Structure formats: structure tokens, C-alpha cells
Amino acid sequence: MVADQAVLSSWRSVVGSLEDDARVSARLMGFVYLAQPQGLIGNTLLLAVPNETTRETLQGTQVADALTDALTQEFREEILLAISIDANLQPPRTPSSEARRSSLAGGPSGAAAPDVELPPAATAATSRRAVAEELPGFRIEPPADVVPAANAAPNGNGKPTPAPPSTSAETSRLNDRYHFETFVIGSSNRFAHAAANAVAEAPAKAYNPLFIYGESGLGKTHLLHAIGHYARRLYPGLRVRYVNSEEFTNDFINSIRHDEGASFKQVYRNVDILLIDDIQFLADKEATVEEFFHTFNTLYNNNKQVVITSDLPPKQLSGFEDRLRSRFEWGLITDIQPPDLETRIAILRKKAEAEGLVAPPEALEYIASRISTNIRELEGALIRVTAFASLNRQTVDIELAEHVLKDLITDETAHEITPELILHATGEYFNLTLEELTSKSRTRTLVTARQIAMYLLRELTEMSLPKIGQVLGGRDHTTVIHADRKIRELMAERRTIYNQVTELTNEIKRKQRGA
């Protein structure tokens, strides 16, 4: 795919804007210059880069925010990015790029260019597959260039035989934020953590399948990704694939629509570890459940590991046939309970360290004592408290935390916060109709309202990312991730955004209590 002249011209304008952006240093611009536009599909710009380091740099917060702002200004609408790797990518030979390279090299003076350390690049086939997976509705390509799973299958000693490193990182869908090292262990999750660790060290030998259940926001998804990362670190040739049940359903439907059933089977049945999240959402989807049943059987019979999460244990799952529920019980079933006070404090401490948030131990203890059931809401409370302190140039202490959280603590006897409640309250607050809120329009007010709604749906409900995108006009889950991150950051930078989120949350809580 080659970008047309209009897209190339727009990209040059975006690069020019970034050169004047204080957030993007000369070193970071060195990575920007390596990117080349491949085309614009809908509101998604396809960029190709020569290696993983460049892609990770462009996706980092510092560059991504500046890039998103520049793209929005250039195209006058919110533009998403899909960045792929192309090992054969050649730098564009244009006067402007030559001038930039000359500038980076110091021009006539011959000064040194920015010190950019680049690793070996991935293959072009990996690039095509990465683009296909990052764009909604794209057909699934079989990972033909990856080392066969059989090469990494567990041997007779119960350990997989290490295979040559593969390029399966792009197909695994693993989130780099979730590792065992960042998982806080407590009495409520110790056994689940130990089981997950054992599965990663000996796939299909320790517990197969491993079934982890518990309420939303307690760390089940974190453990799934951690299993994948640890297993791939131990056995580089291992094929791992993470998928939530809604993505599995969408991939299955697309395979039928495009008559690519064989490709779908190759993607999901030719792996060493399948990590499937929120299996309960497959309930009553007969054709999809049937396909998963056969996928499970194929993997299990070929001595491949399956790890499943759910909000309920197998026996309590409705909408599944007994033959599938019984298979969930073949291995190990373990649960995760809400964390105790000590674990909640440890979670907040680790979150504060990771995000660079300043909060004394007594403030962390106060927050942990007030929110006891949901880790996502617990971390959200910490972000609100520290954001309020930053905006008002105050020090975080118990009194400040108490003031910020006084209207946010949920009464356990109150009604459940539903998506409808959040969307209705958001529409009222911003004087928008539900149709406008879920439309494709991207005026500034609508974009802000929509992003705040996504943030609140993420924080106050148990909805998955794809489901949140679905109720807001069928948007991709990556849009939800971007909105959640954007609002978190803006709350600490802009008083208007902080006030809007706080006032809207208070109104939702008030309606929840029936006040």
C-alpha cells in the first residue's frame, strides 16, 4: 500500500508541526523521521517504521500525544494510528527529508546526529500482519512466517523445547504493562498467582486448562498477560495468543464473512498457549461457542495450554453446554477475591511508584480503607486525589483525600451503575443527545464528552474495552484505551477537565443512590 500525494503532503505538515513542538526533542524527532505513511483508511493512518524500537517510541506517551494533536489539527478530526514494522523500509529521498537529515547531522559543520540505537528489524510479513490486527474489520492472515508451534511444544521433561526466536510478538496481543513483576500478591490472589506462574513455566504440564474466576477489576487479565510474557521469555519460540471473548467472536464472524475459516483455525489452533479473557461473554452465541469447543479440543489434544478467565466458576456459567463446562473443570480452577487492606495499600504504593505520583503512606492507607472491592476504582481514586493536589498546588494528605473522595465512595446498598446511567448523565451534563454522543461527529465538545464517558465507563463499571467501544457508536477498543489515558493525564493538567469529571461522577453517584 502506498500513500497518495494528499496523505504524504499532510504527513509532511504533521512532521513540520512536531519540529516546533516542545514536547518532541531532537532525539525523538529522529524516530519520527523514520516513519512513512502508507495510507489513510477511514480515520486510521497507517504508518510503517523500520523496527520495534521506533514503533515503541512513537507509541510512547510523550510522542503519541504530540502526534495525535498534530494529526487532529491537520485532518480536522480525531485520527487513530496503526504502526507496522517493515524491515525493507527505505528513507524517503525528498528534498525536505534530505534537509532534515543534513540538519540532524549538523549540516556543514558535521556535528553528530542524535544517538539513536536501533535493534534488528522485524520482517515485512510481520508488518502486514500487525496492520491487519490493529485495524478493525481487517482479514486475519495466518502467521506463516512464525516458527511452527510443534518446535516449541513441551518435551517429555514437562518443559517446552526452546525454539529459535520468532516474530510472534505482534500476533500475541500481549499488553506490555502486565507482568508478574508488577502484580501485587496478597492472600486474596496468592494461589491464582502461583498457578499462573506454574503454567508459564511448564505449559500444558502443570494445569491444563487453568480456569481463573472472580469479579471484574481484581487482576485476572493482568495474570493472563503475565503468563504470556513469562512463557515467551522462557521459551522464545513459543506461540502465545491473548484474546478476549468479544474479539474471538468478532474474528470468527469476520472469518465467515470473508470465507476465511481455514485462516481463523490456523490462527487460533496453531498456538502453544491460548489465553482467553471473560469467557462468560460467549454465552448463548451458539456458533461461536461451537467453534471455541472445537478449538479447545484441538489445543488440548495436541498438548497445548489453555488459560481461561470468567466472572463465575464453570458450574455457574449459563449459556454453555455441559460438555464445554465439564472441559473447563479438567484442569485447575482457582479464584481471585477482593484484596484485603494490606494488599490494597501495596497496590496503591506500586501504582504511585509506576506513575510517579506523590502520596504519603497515611493517605494511601486512607484511600485503601475506603475502597475495598475493585482495583480499577481503587487506582482511579488515587489518580483523582493526586490530580486534585497537582491542580491546587497542595500536598497530598488524609484531609485532602477525604475531601476529594467524600462524594465518590459507593454505598454498597445503592443500585448498580449501568452504562445507560453514565451515558444519560454525560449527555445531560454536556447538553448532548445520546445520538450525538455515539455519532461519528468529532467536534471538540463531542470528543471531550465522549472521552470522559469512556473514562467513567472504564472506572465505574465492569465493562470490557470492546463493550465500551460498542456502546459508544461501535468504536474500536484502542480508541477507548486512548480516551482513558488522555483523561487521566488531562485531569492533572487542566482544572476544567478535572471539574467536569468530578461533577459528572458526583451526579452519577447521586442518581445511583436515588437521591
From Swiss-Prot:
GO biological process, one term: DNA replication initiation
Region annotated Domain I, interacts with DnaA modulators, chain positions: 1-89
Primary site of residence: cytoplasm
GO CC terms: cytoplasm; plasma membrane
Transmembrane segments: none
Compositionally biased region (Low complexity): 102-114, 143-160
Region of interest called Disordered, as start-end residue ranges on this chain: 90-130, 142-171
Pfam families: Bac_DnaA, Bac_DnaA_C
Domain III, AAA+ region: annotated segments: 173-389
NCBIfam families the record matches: DnaA, PRK14086.1
Entry's family note: Belongs to the DnaA family.
Function: Plays an essential role in the initiation and regulation of chromosomal replication. ATP-DnaA binds to the origin of replication (oriC) to initiate formation of the DNA replication initiation complex once per cell cycle. Binds the DnaA box (a 9 base pair repeat at the origin) and separates the double-stranded (ds)DNA. Forms a right-handed helical filament on oriC DNA; dsDNA binds to the exterior of the filament while single-stranded (ss)DNA is stabiized in the filament's interior.
Protein name, per record: Chromosomal replication initiator protein DnaA
Gene that produces this protein: dnaA
